């Protein structure tokens, strides 16, 4: 998880 869309 680095970004919101990386979930």
Curated annotation (Swiss-Prot):
GO terms for molecular function: acid phosphatase activity. Coiled coil: none annotated. Its EC number is 3.1.3.2. The keyword Glycoprotein applies. Its main location: secreted. Glycosylated. It catalyses: a phosphate monoester + H2O = an alcohol + phosphate. It comes from the Eukaryota. GO terms for cellular component: extracellular region. Monomer. This is Purple acid phosphatase isozyme LeSAP2. It comes from Solanum lycopersicum.
């Amino acid at each position: 998880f680095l970004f919101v869309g990386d979930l």
